């Protein structure tokens, strides 16, 4: 385990102390838990922001040659 020194606001420190006492653990253990939990949660998929952003035929991949080279008869 790597040692890390951080600065936190006093109100956060007080809240950590209260929660640590309630759980009968250390503030450091709580911080490790909170950080690990946050890092495990996947963030929003940036591709989701594009869903519904484009107008056009629903599936151009089925007719890519027609779209790129013009319709073939």
From Swiss-Prot:
<dbReference type="GO" id="GO:0097351">
    <property type="term" value="F:toxin sequestering activity"/>
</dbReference>
<dbReference type="InterPro" id="IPR002145">
    <property type="entry name" value="CopG"/>
</dbReference>
<dbReference type="Pfam" id="PF01402">
    <property type="entry name" value="RHH_1"/>
</dbReference>
<dbReference type="GO" id="GO:0098754">
    <property type="term" value="P:detoxification"/>
</dbReference>
<dbReference type="GO" id="GO:0006355">
    <property type="term" value="P:regulation of DNA-templated transcription"/>
</dbReference>
<dbReference type="GO" id="GO:0003677">
    <property type="term" value="F:DNA binding"/>
</dbReference>
<comment type="function">
    <text>Antitoxin component of a type II toxin-antitoxin (TA) system. Upon expression in E.coli neutralizes the toxic effect of cognate toxin VapC20.</text>
</comment>
<protein>
    <recommendedName>
        <fullName>Antitoxin VapB20</fullName>
    </recommendedName>
</protein>
<keyword id="KW-1277">Toxin-antitoxin system</keyword>
<keyword id="KW-0238">DNA-binding</keyword>
């Amino acid at each position: 385990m790597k040692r890390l020194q951080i600065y936190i606001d006093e109100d956060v420190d007080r809240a950590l102390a209260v929660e640590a006492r309630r759980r009968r653990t250390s503030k450091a253990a709580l911080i490790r838990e909170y950080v690990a939990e946050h890092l495990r949660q996947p963030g929003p998929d940036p591709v989701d922001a594009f869903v519904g952003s484009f107008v056009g035929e629903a599936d151009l991949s089925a007719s890519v040659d027609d779209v790129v080279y013009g319709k073939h008869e």
